[in-house]
Regions:
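Conserved ATP/PPi-binding loop(s) of AMP-dependent carboxylate-activating enzymes
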Residues: 388-392, 404-438, 475-477
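Conserved C-terminal "lid"/linker of ANL adenylate-forming enzymes
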Residues: 470, 496-499, 509-511, 533-592
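Conserved AMP-binding/adenylation subdomain of ANL enzymes
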Residues: 235-257, 265-306
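Gly/Ser/Thr-rich phosphate-binding loop
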Residues: 159-164, 175-182, 305-308, 320-382, ...
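AMP-binding/adenylate-forming catalytic core of the ANL superfamily
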Residues: 106, 114, 125-129, 307, ...
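Conserved AMP-binding/adenylate-forming
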Residues: 43-48, 61-106, 255, 259-264, ...
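N-lobe entry segment of adenylate-forming
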Residues: 1-48, 52-67, 71, 152-180, ...
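Conserved adenylate-forming
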Residues: 67-69, 194-211, 215-260, 282
Length: 592
């Protein structure tokens, strides 16, 4: 059947099912039945078939129920991307409970706030995490802690120890002190997995769970919030994204082995890195990492066909240089959370070429509230093109005040309409939220906070993010747009523009990480500063040009691997206070 998405997608993908009553468990059971002999998960040396995965989920569900977990209960899973978390998400959904996912190195302050926010009664953590969190457990709603081990599941049923596994040290020390009122159990004792599905596969499962998966929403620790996603929303997302994830299989006839560099505690990480992959029969390569260095271990260990990551984590591969063969197995990179600059893409392609590979780099645009809504294939010529809507999703460029369409080529706010929204509430409940509006066409539209435009080919361009938008004089200023202009300058590795108060009013200062060699030659550094200013004069309106350039060895990142704006601003202000008036802002690199 012809549809407006047939212009962009093959007919068999252009009309996805945009409504479903399947639970997560039902969806994964369907995939396991369809692909029984395919490998579903790889974790270290262990490979789990889809047929075995279903057995393990059924047994895990029975064990959670035996522990006392009931419909509506919340279990915190803090160990990251490993089989314990994956099995538990689907098993908890089967019995009507919810999985609250979070980063494995969450601070104690946020751990307490998040646990209380979601009213968690149970928590799965490693020995090392227990050492960090045991002292604050009594401040939370948690009553039962289950200790899991990274190394146990990394080597599977064999008893061979993989000492080089980066997180082996997190399996110690063994818990000694148990706070009063807390029950402590061990995963291997409470969840004996015998892969015997006949015992549990026909046990009843709950079909009315409106908050299957919970995520920590960025906020103050004392006022934590959670993003709640239903199974229906996640399953529709899997339908709309199927073509993106099956592209390799469509070309080769074989499922792809995909490594997600995003922790499952984030919407993009779980949805695109685990659930959507399993839903369409691909192989998920599981890896939990606490810092960027471990990314390279995972790539070398698994030799994946496809990498999935945020733009920050994927771009960190560039730092390893063109002499590396890190991408020798990789055919495709799927980037979410922002667009790569042309220089970042060029470096990735160069690294791939040095390994004798032809690399494809595509993008997925989305947000926690709507999951993913746009797809940008690798052959887009402009690095400002976010591409076109995923199948089943409507996009438009609207006036942010009136909600009406703007003329072709004019700038406005990117707005999105997707049937996923209806799973979050009624029309009245949605329109009470700040980003949702009912427009004259009768549909509920989500205002994304991104400024964009659309050309005559119905392609969407990202102009800038409204976050941190300010006005200098009467001109709207988008710091993210400044960053993009600066990063086009040769020698710039990263850039982040901050708004700083001065006696003359708000000014822009761009924090820049240059290539390493610039720190050893002051004349090179000053030449780079001049070239950045020239690029900004060429590309940006006068009000959008930074008043100064500050050079740093590195920029602080948050747990998603994304530059932390507030921390950068603090760093810039501190450097300003240390440098004499009239001197250039340059951080002194640490001594070797």
């Amino acid at each position: 059947m012809e549809s407006q998405w047939s212009v962009f997608y093959p007919e068999n993908y252009a009309n996805p099912v945009t409504d479903t009553d399947e639970t997560l468990y039902m969806r994964i059971k369907r995939a396991c039945t369809r692909y029984p002999d395919r490998i579903a998960l790889e974790y270290g040396a262990r490979k789990i078939l889809y047929s075995t995965l279903l057995s393990m989920i059924d047994e895990t569900a029975a064990s959670w129920k035996k522990l006392g977990v009931q419909k509506g209960d919340v279990v915190m899973l803090v160990m990251g991307n490993n089989p314990i978390n994956v099995l538990s998400v689907y098993a908890l959904d089967k019995i009507g409970a919810s999985a609250a996912l979070c980063v494995p190195n969450l601070s104690t302050e946020y751990f307490v706030g998040y646990a209380n926010c979601v009213n968690a009664k149970y928590c799965v953590m490693s020995c090392n995490q227990y050492l960090n969190y045991s002292s604050v457990l009594k401040e939370t709603t948690i009553k039962t802690v289950i200790i899991g081990k990274y190394r146990e599941t990394s080597v599977g049923i064999t008893k061979v120890k993989v000492l080089f596994y980066p997180l082996a040290s997190y399996d110690t020390p063994r818990p000694r002190n148990v706070p009063e009122g807390i029950t402590l159990k061990y995963w291997k004792d409470a969840f004996p997995l015998n892969n015997n599905s006949t015992t549990h596969e026909n046990s009843p499962h709950d079909r009315d769970n409106n908050r299957t998966v919970l995520y920590l929403f960025p906020s103050l620790a004392a006022a934590c919030k959670a993003t709640e996603l239903s199974a229906r929303a996640l399953n529709v997302s899997a339908n709309t994204a199927e073509m993106v994830l099956k592209a390799n299989e469509d070309l080769t006839g074989k499922p792809a082995r995909m490594l997600c560099l995003n922790e499952s505690c984030f919407t993009f990480g779980f949805t695109f890195g685990i659930h959507n992959l399993l839903s369409c029969g691909q192989t998920v390569l599981l890896f939990t990492w606490y810092n960027a260095d471990k990314i390279f271990f995972a790539i070398r260990k698994y030799k994946p066909d496809v990498l999935i990551g945020y733009n920050g984590t994927v771009a960190s591969i560039n730092k390893i240089g063109v002499s590396s063969d890190i991408l020798k197995s990789v055919d495709r990179i799927i980037v979410g959370g922002g667009l790569l600059t042309s220089s970042q893409k060029a470096m990735l392609f160069e690294i791939a070429r040095s390994s004798g590979k032809k690399l494809s780099v595509c993008s997925i645009t989305g947000c926690d509230e709507l999951l993913a809504y746009a797809y940008g294939p690798s052959d887009l010529q402009s690095d400002r093109l976010i591409g076109f809507p995923l199948p089943g999703i409507l996009m438009r460029i609207s006036d942010p005040d009136t909600g009406l369409d703007v003329p072709e080529g004019a700038e406005g706010e990117i707005t999105v309409c997707t049937l996923i929204s209806k799973f979050f509430g009624s029309d009245e409940e949605l329109t009470a939220m700040p980003n949702y509006r009912k427009l004259p066409d009768g549909r509920i539209w989500y205002f994304t906070g991104n400024i964009g435009k659309q050309d005559g080919n119905k392609m969407f361009y990202l102009v800038a993010s409204k976050s941190r938008e300010t006005r200098i004089g009467s001109y709207p200023v988008y710091p993210s747009k400044v960053d993009e202009a600066v990063q086009m300058t040769e020698g710039v590795v990263e850039a982040c523009t901050v708004i700083v108060d001065s006696p003359e009013g708000a000014v822009l200062i761009t924090a820049v990480v240059p290539s390493e060699e610039y720190f050893f030659d002051n004349s090179l550094m000053e030449d780079l500063r001049d070239r950045i200013k020239s690029e900004c004069e060429l590309m940006l309106h006068e009000a959008m040009r930074p008043s100064d350039i500050a050079f740093f060895v590195s920029l602080p990142k948050n747990s998603k691997g994304v530059i932390d704006y507030e921390a950068v601003k603090e760093k810039v202000e501190m450097l300003q206070s240390e440098v004499n008036i009239g001197e250039n802002l340059t951080e002194t690199p640490p001594a070797d």
